[in-house]
UniProtKB/Swiss-Prot annotation:
ATP binds at G118, T119, N120, G121, K122, T123, T124. It comes from Staphylococcus epidermidis (strain ATCC 35984 / DSM 28319 / BCRC 17069 / CCUG 31568 / BM 3577 / RP62A). Keywords: ATP-binding, Cell cycle, Cell division, Cell shape, Cell wall biogenesis/degradation, Cytoplasm, Ligase, Nucleotide-binding, Peptidoglycan synthesis. This is UDP-N-acetylmuramoylalanine--D-glutamate ligase. Cell wall formation. Catalyzes the addition of glutamate to the nucleotide precursor UDP-N-acetylmuramoyl-L-alanine (UMA). InterPro entries: Mur-like_cat_sf, Mur_ligase_C, Mur_ligase_C_dom_sf, Mur_ligase_cen, MurD. It catalyses: UDP-N-acetyl-alpha-D-muramoyl-L-alanine + D-glutamate + ATP = UDP-N-acetyl-alpha-D-muramoyl-L-alanyl-D-glutamate + ADP + phosphate + H(+). GO terms for cellular component: cytoplasm. Its EC number is 6.3.2.9.
């Protein structure tokens, strides 16, 4: 960790605890700042809050009193806290500096950064790059939205290692100096409009990933969305990926992944399922090549890497039916990819938090859907969708009940796919919890020998 002294004796207010706020507060204390933590929820019984208080950090919870801004603190905002929260709006009015925990990770480390963002595919790309590093002599440390708090990992990473960081639009909004050596934008579609309010705001948040890059850095983008960045004043070297045509970067030709005229691997040898994952693979391969990962290590990864938990994750077979856990599909685009990944009849488990979306854009991808099992707040919307397409629709109370209900109607070689197309927060704390419940219920129905 760098000997970073700019926050020494400065007043810093961490808004929003959770995991990243907790780690940020501890780091700020280590950097010599005068730290307070504020959260709108009551944290009187929270273990992390009590731990911070034992270190001498004042925790104010249950409301957002503006008096916390009177000593002109630097604000470190948990990425999940919208800028429309009252205390953040007031801080902005007063002209106070507002950072996120990811910015701290950059300030305290000299390690080069590979940063990955996008509406879909960012977790897969981040994990795959990490696996490619692991297969080589180079060291890459996963961090960010993938589950490892960036500022925590940044304290441990060495200057000759890479930080491989997944970034959400929430995290990117608060960057000031953050500069990845290699930035990847997998794709940008409409998402999180409940947070960003407009598609333009969401797109602009994603574009923050390259705003500080120089001519010595690299930007990797989807060729078929190049219009989103072509008008920008880019300094970084820009490369593209495409599954459809030759581009300045990496592409697929005659069934092979090709970079710089060199065939890397035949796509038939890839283990990761789904047509959409070809784009994720191209982005990961290109970033790893730029970072210096040997081609042999890249190929070793591609012939063994089968994906990440909760993203089109194959969890097993019961009788002749393969089960796939795609709980991380919290929007319709991710579910489009999932439905498009199978030629067999699909029993589709879907539903969740109602964000006001309609789901008609899924209709072109429902050809192979034989049965829909619907649950959650959007249950009636999905039932209406299924009925309009002549699908057999079953209503369930939750994911576990959905798995129970299909046992008597599943037919040989049906694929059972959990791909909710919705967030999980109506019934589960996280998409991971929802996915684990699905896996547990699948296992409960396995025959015992």
């Amino acid at each position: 960790m760098l000997n970073y002294t700019e926050l020494e004796n400065k007043n810093v207010l961490v808004v929003g605890l959770a995991k990243s706020g907790y780690e940020a507060a501890k780091l700020l204390l280590k950097l010599g700042a005068n730290v307070k933590v504020n959260d709108g929820k009551d944290l009187s019984q929270d273990a992390h809050a009590k731990d911070l208080e034992s270190m001498g950090i004042e925790v104010i919870s249950g409301s957002h009193p503006f008096s916390l801004l009177d000593d002109n603190p630097i604000i470190v905002k948990n990425p999940g806290i919208p800028y429309t929260v009252s205390i953040i709006e007031e801080a902005a009015k007063r002209g106070l500096k507002i950072l996120t925990e990811v910015e701290l990770s950059y300030l305290i480390s000299e390690a080069p950064i590979i940063a990955v963002t996008g509406t879909n595919g960012k977790t897969t790309v981040t994990s795959l790059i990490g696996d490619m590093f692991q297969k080589s002599v180079l060291t890459g440390r996963l961090s960010g939205n993938i589950g490892y708090v960036a500022s925590n990992v940044a304290q441990e990473v060495k200057s000759d290692e890479y930080l491989i960081t997944e970034l959400s639009s929430f995290q990117l909004l608060g960057i000031e100096k953050y500069k990845p050596h290699i930035a990847i934008i997998t794709n940008i579609y409409s998402a999180h409009l409940d947070y960003h309010e407009t598609l333009e705001n969401y797109q602009n948040a994603k574009k923050q990933i390259y705003k500080n890059q120089t001519k010595d850095d690299y930007l990797i983008c989807n060729y078929h969305q190049r219009h989103l960045i072509e008008s920008e004043n880019l300094e970084a070297k820009t490369f593209y990926f495409s599954t459809q045509q030759e581009v300045d970067g990496i592409y697929i030709k005659d069934g092979f992944i090709v970079f710089n005229g060199i065939r890397i691997i035949n796509t038939k040898d890839l283990v990761l399922p789904g047509e959409h994952n070809l784009e994720n693979i191209l982005a990961a391969v290109l970033a790893s090549i730029i970072a210096g990962v040997p081609v042999k290590a890249i190929v070793d990864s591609l012939v063994t890497f089968s994906g990440i938990d909760h993203r089109l994750q194959y969890i097993g077979t019961n009788r002749t039916n393969k089960y796939y856990n795609d709980s991380k599909a919290t929007n319709t685009l991710a579910t489009q990819f999932a439905l498009n990944s199978f030629d067999q009849p699909i029993i589709w488990l879907c539903g969740g938090l109602d964000r006001g979306n309609e789901f008609d854009e899924l209709i072109p991808y429902m050809e192979n859907v034989r049965v829909m099992v619907v649950f959650g707040e959007t249950q009636d919307k999905f039932a209406k969708l299924g009925n309009s397409q002549g699908k057999y629709v079953i209503k369930a109370t939750d994911v576990e009940d959905a798995v129970d209900k299909i046992q008597d109607i599943v037919e040989p070689n049906d694929v059972v796919l959990l791909s909710p197309a919705c967030a999980s927060w109506d019934q589960y704390h996280t998409f991971e919890e929802r996915g684990e419940k699905f896996i547990d219920r699948f296992r409960a129905h396995l025959p015992s020998y």
